Amino acid sequence: MPSLLFTCFLVQLLIHLVNTFGAATINNLLWNLYNMLPTPTSQSAGEQKKLKREYMKVRQEMNATSSQDEFAKWAKLRRQHDKLYDQLEKSKSSLDSTKSTFDTSVSTLRWLGTNGLRMLLQFWFSKQAMFWLPKGWFPYYAEWLLSFPRAPLGSISIQAWTLACAAVILLVSDALVAVVALVLGARTGVQGQKAKKMEEPMKAGGQGTEKAGKKEL
């Protein structure tokens, strides 16, 4: 059953990615992508971004204006600031309600497509052998554990295969993270050495100038 083997591996990989990046991060990414499409909330999201830019611009200008020396200008900016703030809060409240519903729907679909699908596969194919072990290579208790709970004795059950996939994915993920950290650390070290080499001639030149000045004195 190569297709079932690959399906189990893919589901476990998706679960690992969700756990690694976090559900909130994925929800925010999907929400931003959703608002880029011609959806009912895309216009509201665009207006909110526009209001936010105007609000920040007015706020910066108001903070840069003295309320004592330029009171008339400051008061006008203050009224604009308060008006934009109220509009921004109303827009944010409306979008937050929609986003909450969106997050709930996405979280439900994500669970059904990952953990729910994994549980369904493990239940539906619990009596089916993923593949068979070479006869006589493993003791009875090992064959029993690998076929647990309901697969034929001497075979690999879907539960055992799922655990093996999870272990391999975790090991590969940790190895990739370690390699990336090592490469970034090596680059940082090389850049630090280059910076030190550039500083040494500058220090030497500065010391030479100081000595020359002392001799002249």
Curated annotation (Swiss-Prot):
Matches recorded under HAMAP family: Get1
Keywords from the UniProt entry: Coiled coil, Endoplasmic reticulum, Membrane, Transmembrane, Transmembrane helix, Transport
Topological domains annotated Lumenal: 1-4, 132-155
Main location per the UniProt record: endoplasmic reticulum
GO molecular function terms listed in the Swiss-Prot or TrEMBL record: protein-membrane adaptor activity
Family (UniProt): Belongs to the WRB/GET1 family.
Protein location: Endoplasmic reticulum membrane
UniProt source species: Sclerotinia sclerotiorum (strain ATCC 18683 / 1980 / Ss-1)
Known partners and oligomeric status: Interacts with get3.
Region (Disordered): 195-217
Coiled coil regions, renumbered to chain: 43-97
Keyword Transport: yes
Membrane topology listed for this record: Multi-pass membrane protein
Bilayer-spanning residue ranges: 5-24, 111-131, 156-172
Gene Ontology biological-process annotations: tail-anchored membrane protein insertion into ER membrane
Signal peptide segment: none
Task of the protein: Required for the post-translational delivery of tail-anchored (TA) proteins to the endoplasmic reticulum. Acts as a membrane receptor for soluble get3, which recognizes and selectively binds the transmembrane domain of TA proteins in the cytosol.
Name of the protein in its database record: Protein get1
